[in-house]
Amino acid sequence: MSNFSPREIVSELDRYIIGQKEAKRAVAIALRNRWRRQQLEPGLREEVMPKNILMIGPTGVGKTEISRRLAKLAGAPFVKVEATKFTEVGYVGRDVEQIVRDLVEVAIALTREKMREGVEARAHLNAEERVLEALVGRTASPATRDSFRQKLRSGELDDKEIEIQVADAGGGMGSFEIPGMPGANIGVLNINDMLQKAMGGGRTKTVKTTVKDSYKFLINDESDKLLDQDEVVRRALSSAENDGIVFIDEIDKIASREGGMGAGVSREGVQRDLLPLVEGTTVATKYGPVKTDHVLFIASGAFHVAKPSDLLPELQGRLPIRVELRALEKEDFRRILTETEASLIKQYIALMETEGVELEFTEDAIVRLAEVAVDLNASVENIGARRLQTVMERVLDEISYNAPDRSGSKMVIDAAYVDQHVGDLAKNTDLSRFIL
């Protein structure tokens, strides 16, 4: 767990997300509180619960991105789920406990990756021995092996093709599922794992690859042999329980409006199933039981039709921190195009560079792109920052199509060029409803 201060966390989020200071502050404090909790004595540490967050705001304003960047910054296990994908227990569909099982799988992958770094040097040496074995065989003399080892390290043999045996991660029978209930028992009964243990280890497969590319397979393979798999699982479960972040999107879609009938019953059932998960329960996974008491839950929704007060009172109480994200304005769009770390403009310039085409956007073009995006959001449907992608694709459609034939040329995009390609379309809202 990183020990960034709230100000540093907000500053890092500012590199990728424009505006939404209140939401950034809320998640920054939540992340810092996790670090603070780790500094407490064990008895008190168990009593400090995370303050779950409810984000309210229209689509495309940064709700998901804030959570995703936060998890990346913290190096924490993170899963994003949509509330509408789940059904209450007893109905056909995924049950909410699958969220925790997915979180554990992410934690296992993250932990294994971190632990591999600690044994990478030894794994590299072991991988080198296996490459030599593939090149000269097991019976080669020490002098021959040393000669090939020097060639291998100098890069002379990089393009030579070899055959290697690596662990077969895919295949097998996978997890057992109850028919008609996809996801119901994933991770609890894994027949593939049971068969592998019965046969004394995992399966292998033969891969044909170049010497250079073989290291990618072999280093991972050798790293896993050096790792204590029980320790990987122990650390991963601890990471999921103490550092895990779950982002539940579209929670407004399972809010039952007053007087609602029919599907409202099932939606309320999903809310009731979420209650113990958010408050703290123990979920059985194939790696062992996982407690959710200290998992941070961030729920979000547009709440166009339903209101936060339409959620079950018990669920509202388990989402104590509420932040409202505002709709984006013209200046926000301009800043998104120019100030973010990997802005759309930087992406398109880099993409065209691969074709030998130099792309340049004038300041008035950027302002015009922002204006068109705002106008379309107002007149058609407000999809937030995602509108910029459709506008940019429309503007650069011709350049992208002809780029291979224009290698070595320079293209300047100004306001007139933007108007020429999307101006009329933006004005005709009936038409743009279907095209943009």
From Swiss-Prot:
Tree of life domain: Bacteria
Main location, first listed in the record: cytoplasm
GO terms for MF: ATP binding; ATP hydrolysis activity; peptidase activity; proteasome-activating activity
Positions of transmembrane segments: none
A Pfam family reported for this protein in Swiss-Prot or TrEMBL: AAA_2
SUPFAM superfamilies: P-loop containing nucleoside triphosphate hydrolases (SSF52540)
Localization per record: Cytoplasm
GO biological process: one example: protein unfolding
Statement: the UniProt record of this protein carries the keyword Iron-sulfur: no
Cleaved signal peptide residues: none
Biological role: ATPase subunit of a proteasome-like degradation complex; this subunit has chaperone activity. The binding of ATP and its subsequent hydrolysis by HslU are essential for unfolding of protein substrates subsequently hydrolyzed by HslV. HslU recognizes the N-terminal part of its protein substrates and unfolds these before they are guided to HslV for hydrolysis.
Family statement drawn from the similarity comment of this UniProt entry: Belongs to the ClpX chaperone family. HslU subfamily.
Name of the protein in its database record: ATP-dependent protease ATPase subunit HslU
Organism: Chelativorans sp. (strain BNC1)
Lineage: Bacteria, Pseudomonadati, Pseudomonadota, Alphaproteobacteria, Hyphomicrobiales
Gene behind this protein: hslU
